[in-house]
Each structure stands twice: as C-alpha cells, then as structure tokens.
C-alpha cells in the first residue's frame, strides 16, 4: 500500500518498502490503491511500465479509481503496446453492487480480473452484526455508507 499520491516518487517508495519488507526482488502484482485525483493517466502509466520493465513488478492493477480513469490507462497502454492494468479491486458485496454498473463492463472489455474487497460487507452478511450498528460505525470503523 502506498501513501502520498500516485506520482512516481511515492509509488517507487511504496514499491521499495514492500520489496524490503517481503524480502524479495519483485512483486507478482502491484496495486495502485486509490486514485489521487491529480496524477495524469499518462504519468501513472509511464511509472508502472518502468516498474515492469525494470523487473520490479510483473503486473499491476487499480483499486478504487473511477472507471473512466482506468479505461484511459488501459486504452493508452493498448495503443502504446505497453503493459496496462490487469486487475481491478473494489468494494463488492450483496449489499453494494455498484461495481456492476461501470467497472465490470470495463474489466470485461479490457480483459481485466476483478478482486472484490469486503464481500461480506464489513461482516454484515455474516449475520453477526445488525445493519444499524454497522452503518453507525462509519467507513473508517468498518461500517459503510448506506
């Protein structure tokens, strides 16, 4: 996981930190987690391609980014003949199926895999928690916005 945005400096720092902690030379899959609303798609693509070509990562994916931004990345990668995102990671459960509107068609169109996070809706679907308790907790505490 990285903090500080999607610019090259922050992504490389996150990558090197992960490699060090995992005591490995490369990652099979590097997630760009959360779009920063600032970094142009072209810049992010260049950074990710450089990481792949350097042998630091084999593949990369996007988590919690707008569908239009991921589509732009995938299109640029296709046109340029460079490695684009191969997977998407988003909140997806029986409680919230918003992913089906834009992101699943995007994944299908560009041949990307989809990895859901919190498929049990922060535990709500286990039956262990009451919906009002989960909603009241808010997203930071493991709840969700209704």
Identify the function of each model-found stretch.
Residues 19-40:
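Active-site groove signature of glycoside hydrolases
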Residues 36-146:
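Beta/alpha (TIM)-barrel catalytic core signal, keyed to glycine-rich beta->alpha loops juxtaposed to Asp/Glu
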Residues 6-22, 43-46, 68-75:
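Short, acidic/polar
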């Amino acid at each position: 996981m990285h903090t500080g945005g999607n610019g090259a400096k922050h992504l490389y720092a996150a990558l090197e930190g992960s490699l060090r902690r995992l005591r490995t030379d490369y990652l099979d899959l590097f997630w760009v987690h959360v779009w920063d609303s600032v970094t142009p798609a072209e810049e992010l693509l260049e950074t990710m391609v450089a990481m792949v070509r350097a042998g630091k990562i084999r593949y990369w994916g996007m988590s919690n980014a707008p569908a239009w931004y991921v589509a732009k990345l995938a299109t640029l990668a296709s046109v340029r003949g460079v490695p684009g995102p191969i997977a998407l990671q988003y909140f997806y459960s029986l409680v919230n199926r918003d992913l089906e509107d834009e992101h699943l068609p995007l994944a299908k169109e560009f041949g990307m895999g989809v990895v859901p996070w919190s498929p049990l809706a922060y535990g709500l679907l286990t039956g262990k928690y009451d919906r009002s308790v989960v909603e009241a907790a808010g997203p930071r505490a493991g709840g969700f916005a209704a």
